[in-house]
Amino acid sequence: TEALLYTDEHEGMAAAQIFGNDPEILRAACENEKLAPFPIVDINMGCPVPKIYKNGEGSALLENPALAEKIVRECVKSGKIITVKFRIGIDAAHIVTADFAKRMENAGASLITVHGRTKDKVYAGEVQYKEIESAKKAVQIPVIANGGVFSDADADKLLNETGADGVMVARAALFDPQI
């Protein structure tokens, strides 16, 4: 895991992503000297992996917004810029996008990234542009749209349809780092 933290002065500003469900442990992680090169810490509240979800981490926090807020508040105390990545909900019957976005902003997140699918869809299915747009309309902080970006055209469509401030490319970059 330590090898994943490698960075050098030519990279400019870099962020580290963490996940968990214990506010104090996550704050300690933010304050750990190994994260010193990273002025930004992103908290992953969107991971759909069953093991992570069963531990009450990742996308499970969508079902426990009070704990998610506590995590953000605690991590902000570290002095790092705290951002949050999350999904639009657990499933179609439990969409939480706008409310969760507001709660993360109120807890002190400086930016949010919204993956436009529910946890149960993992990486398949249509990206719900309207849900990402609802997050953008609900908060004053920057909103990054995520999900289904495999080309410049996909990124343009995601920006145009959601009004987001930016786009995050994920899996596609593994196959085409120049995307």
Regions found by a protein language model. Name each.
Residues 1-179:
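Flavin-dependent oxidoreductase catalytic cores
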